[in-house]
């Protein structure tokens, strides 16, 4: 049996390593798919996409005003909520600015809330919106403007999950009907109001997203204002990192 010299063995090892490196460079591992969505959450106005259904705020939208005197609300006539001139339910009490709605931008007062979180507390020390469940049917577009290419709807709920009103627990399905992706994708996690970025988990989906997993970076943006919205709009930029 012919013996192989140490030099020949070392040369063979180097050749195999070089061949493996070249093969890897020619056929790199595929990167995880990344795509971008813009979600428009509109509370109040004539065409809302979100509505509180439980808690104090839900009662207001349903025409009931509990604890009116204690927290400063002016009782409507005959216990029935008074709509605006356009027939929509008001989101802000016009007399004292007490919030009638809360969403992903925090408690809403008269004017835009761009200076951080403003929280109205009840007599028990909890925010007025604590425990409020808001149902959403938000529009998803390919760009930040509401008139951008529509990609589908985000349907689900978010819940005011912190006593100080600083977080919302989100659970929704992005029903994508346009563009490259045409299936459903599920999201779950905590959205931090006033934070530059929050993270949501991707918890599966349907079709090509059946076994999807990953995460989404959620960043709040100020709407461009090219399309007039008479409610309170919260624009979210969602960057999705997927494995499936």
From Swiss-Prot:
Localization annotation: Secreted, Extracellular space, Apoplast
Coiled coil: none
Alphabetical list of Pfam families matching this protein: Dirigent (PF03018)
Main localization, broad class: secreted
InterPro entries, sorted: Allene_oxi_cyc_Dirigent, Dirigent
Keyword Signal attached: yes
Source organism superkingdom: Eukaryota
Secretion signal span: 1-25
One GO cellular component term noted in the UniProt record for this chain: apoplast
GO biological process: phenylpropanoid biosynthetic process
Record key words, sorted: Apoplast, Secreted, Signal
PANTHER family: DIRIGENT PROTEIN 18 (PTHR46215:SF1), DIRIGENT PROTEIN 24-RELATED (PTHR46215)
Similarity comment: family membership: Belongs to the plant dirigent protein family.
Chain's role: Dirigent proteins impart stereoselectivity on the phenoxy radical-coupling reaction, yielding optically active lignans from two molecules of coniferyl alcohol in the biosynthesis of lignans, flavonolignans, and alkaloids and thus plays a central role in plant secondary metabolism.
Oligomer status and interactors: Homodimer.
Protein name: Dirigent protein 18
Annotated source species: Arabidopsis thaliana (Mouse-ear cress)
